[in-house]
Amino acid sequence: MAEATKKPADPRTVQLKRVRLSFADSLKDKKPTVKDGVPKHSCNFILESDSPTYEENREKVKKALIAAGEQFNGQPELYKRIMEDDPKRLCYRKGERFKNTEGEVYKGYAGNWAISASGPGGNKNPRRPKLFDRSRKEVPESEILDVCYSGSYADVILSFYGTDTGGLSIFASIEAIRSLQEGERTGGGVYVDASDFDEVDDADDAFEGTSAAGLGVSSAADEDEI
């Protein structure tokens, strides 16, 4: 009997190790990422430059971005074009580009890189990603903010995808988060509303592919080289 053919993994979907959660409150209750936008479950993920997983995570992101561009419009270097023309429409950016309405870089972002992402389903059917605790047990809704809190380190599965809704973009969908339940809480006492988020997170298109199971940029701004 012939062996069953195993479906190859989607190269746009990657697992990142020990990244830090930020703006994690909407993992429990949906919130709009832009003014008057569709409420979604969203979160940012900080890749800390002093982490032992930093370089490996960067390489995974690079490969996923290349695959997303290639599958969207046949351009594996699409992310470079977006980075140069409109960096806010690329979900993976230098930490210094994540600022509040006063133009101040968010605490914990400087010197690092970060990914902004929302749960699967896009605007039409926004859903919460799968959430697990340190022991890989599913997190009850009532405990989400105690387990998947801003500042916690986590292993995450993200899917990157290209879209031209609202402008040429590459976004990321959160498939699953496993909180390691380590790390000091961040964001306490800081007021945050929808205006603090970039419009890039509110696309109509969503990744439709395999679910959870050092990026090189030629940019006019040297500080954006990943």
Residue map of PLM features:
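Glycine-aromatic-enriched beta-strand/loop faces of beta-sandwich-type recognition domains
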Residues: G111-S142
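Exposed beta-sheet edge/beta-hairpin loop segments within beta-rich domains
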Residues: F132-Y153, Y161-F171
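OB-fold/S1-family single-stranded nucleic acid-binding modules
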Residues: D164-R185
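Extracellular structured ligand-interaction cores
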Residues: K40-S42, A110-N112, G151-D155, S169-I174
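Short intrinsically disordered coil segments
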Residues: E59-A64, F132-R136, G188-V200
